[in-house]
Amino acid sequence: MSPRPANPRVRDALLDAARSEFGRAGVAQARVEDIARAAGVSKGAFYLHFDSKEEAFREILHRFLGVLEDHSTRRREAELRFERDVGRPGRETTLQQTLDLDCKLDAELLESLWRNRLIVAALDRAAGPPCLDIVSDFRRRMRSMVGSRIALKQQEGWLRADVDPEVIVDVLLGTYEGYARRMLGMKAKPDFDRWARAFLSLLYQGIRDPSSGARASATHT
């Protein structure tokens, strides 16, 4: 008799249950039977869909990182629309217009981190090369992508050219990783627009080219 085929709905239920259990107990301490019970299925049903709890965690992790990459892609598309419809930051737009756009996009990122905060909790407890390698590879890709965008904005005169782009990337990624961990102890969702605006207002004071504001003001007069 051929094995019973996996059920996509059961698989998703198991992943939801695993996400909660991993966030509560960590991957090492989580038990397959607890995951299966929370999903309303048997332990055998778990092994019909996954070879191990580590495999389930890797799929959860890949989905989470995929959400972050999708956001990065949507962000770039939004920036290009903004440049087309409103103007280029530092040249044809005001600081407030650019800040409002970045706050909106960063608040969306924080919403994604909030929805996936249990994964962040599990990652803090995870050990072993497979998961760490996946996250390290993701960080490298994000660093490269963000660094390229920062360098481009420096070339266009929107950001100061005398600041190392890698330092700006460290500040950006470090801040939002810190925000993600700050969420772990929270029961009520915070005001993400306020978080984003506070950070970006401070960041812009340090890295924005002062002359870009004068150029933008001249464009609007």
Where are these regions (language model features)?
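N-terminal intrinsically disordered/low-complexity leader segments
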Residues: 1-9, 16, 79-89, 211-221
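Amphipathic alpha-helical segments enriched in hydrophobic/aromatic and basic residues
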Residues: 22, 31-32, 43, 53, ...
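Hydrophobic alpha-helical connector segments
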Residues: 59, 72-115, 169
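Short hydrophobic/aromatic patch on the recognition helix
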Residues: 40-50
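Basic, helix-initiating cap at the start of DNA-binding domains
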Residues: 1-25, 29-41, 54-55
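Amphipathic C-terminal alpha-helical segment
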Residues: 112-122, 148, 152, 169-190, ...
